[in-house]
Amino acid sequence: MYTTPELQEFGGANAYLRSCASRSVLDLLSNKWVCLVVGALASGPMRFGALRRRLDGITQKMLTRTLRDLERSGLVAREVFPTTPPQVEYSLTPLGGNLAVLMGEIRVWSEEHMGEITDARSHYDARAEEPVRPL
């Protein structure tokens, strides 16, 4: 699949190289909503409305896009139940469950260190001529 010698040297994947396909995976995983959706589904299957209520601030459009991206990547399974109206439930696949462990650790780390990050940003902004806008 890869012809770049550097990729072959690392067994076909090296995210530090522009030509490595794993960068698209990192792009997906760096989205805050992906982290939060995976975390919410780690506790078990959920319907769209329950997910939306759990994820304060997410729009319907963003939740739909995030779920589609996760389903496309094999991290989330979508099951439609034959009811009237149809009910749809989302759950993590085994691959998504594996990711949930890592995402959970990142979420916990961010919660534990948010005070330090906020302080560092305040100190930086105080030294800068113009405050840096939040990400």
Where do the model's predicted regions map?
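Residues within the helices of the helix-turn-helix
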Residues: G49, R68, V88
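N-terminal helix-turn-helix DNA-binding core of bacterial DNA-binding proteins
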Residues: G12-M62
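Alpha-helical initiation/capping and key positions within long helical/coiled-coil segments
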Residues: A50, M62, S91-P94, N98
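Beta-hairpin "wing" of winged helix-turn-helix
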Residues: E71-S91
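Basic amphipathic alpha-helical segments that dock to polyanions
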Residues: L63, L67-L70
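C-terminal regulatory/oligomerization modules of transcriptional regulators
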Residues: M1-L17, R72, A77, P94-L135
